Amino acid sequence: MKRTKTSKAWMQEHVNDPYVQRAKSEGYRSRAAFKLIELDDRDRLMRSGMVVVDLGAAPGSWSQVALRRVGREGRVFALDLLPLDPLGGVEFIQGDFQEEPVLAELESRLGGLPVDVVLSDMAPNMSGIDTTDQARSIYLGELALEFAGHHLKPGGGFVVKVFQGQGFMEYRNEAAKHFHALHVRKPKASRDRSAEVYLVGVGYRGS
């Protein structure tokens, strides 16, 4: 099968992407690591000894960043619909976060541990219809925020990816109620054409 011009252009962009090259040289599984690194460097959410939950973790680059930041005394729990090659120090659950039994398994693994930081890089299966994909993204963001509301300790942090569009401001305003500060960030590693932004909640107010 011949490659299309679009696929050739994507491959060329991927090969020449400085973040892809850095990910390889620094041992990260994907360029997405540098999105979280930039966000955490700016807002200082993760520190040694913390408990972090990483939703939408595959292929594992955000969990790698979290591991490096919380150290041996911390714990990282990761969840994704897709499989994740083993990462030493990461407790992984494979399943759909939208399904109650999967959520129950994650909560069982946590065993009542208060969580310092909830990360969500979850994205919907893309349909190619912008309004549909954006609505699904907001829904996943709502689920992540609900989980954070049940498990974050007071003062905890929250990072969630959502797509801009209809419903974004309503979601942002709802999230802002739960944190002392809420920032909208677009890391340098995010592609310019992408509708994704990250909401960073600092200082969870408690339920």
From Swiss-Prot:
Keywords: Cytoplasm, Methyltransferase, rRNA processing, S-adenosyl-L-methionine, Transferase
InterPro entries listed in its UniProt record: RNA_methyltr_RlmE (IPR050082), RNA_MeTrfase_FtsJ_dom (IPR002877), rRNA-MeTfrase_E (IPR015507), SAM-dependent_MTases_sf (IPR029063)
Catalytic activity as recorded in UniProt: uridine(2552) in 23S rRNA + S-adenosyl-L-methionine = 2'-O-methyluridine(2552) in 23S rRNA + S-adenosyl-L-homocysteine + H(+)
Domain of life: Bacteria
Family: Belongs to the class I-like SAM-binding methyltransferase superfamily. RNA methyltransferase RlmE family.
HAMAP family: RNA_methyltr_E
Protein name: Ribosomal RNA large subunit methyltransferase E
Source organism of the structure: Aromatoleum aromaticum (strain DSM 19018 / LMG 30748 / EbN1)
The organism's taxonomic lineage, starting at the top: Bacteria, Pseudomonadati, Pseudomonadota, Betaproteobacteria, Rhodocyclales
Gene name per UniProt: rlmE
